[in-house]
Amino acid sequence: CPCGRRRCCVRGLNVYCCF
């Protein structure tokens, strides 16, 4: 994932950057 230093979180079918 293009999250930079943040890790990638997966929730169901959504993939996003962890806050």
Curated annotation (Swiss-Prot):
Entry similarity comment: Belongs to the alpha-defensin family.
Main location (coarse class): secreted
UniProt entry keywords in alphabetical sequence: Antibiotic, Antimicrobial, Defensin, Disulfide bond, Secreted
Localisation: Secreted
Protein name: Corticostatin-related peptide LCRP
A cellular component term, taken from the record's GO annotations: extracellular region
Cysteines paired by S-S bonds: C1-C18, C3-C9, C8-C17
GO annotation, biological process: defense response to bacterium
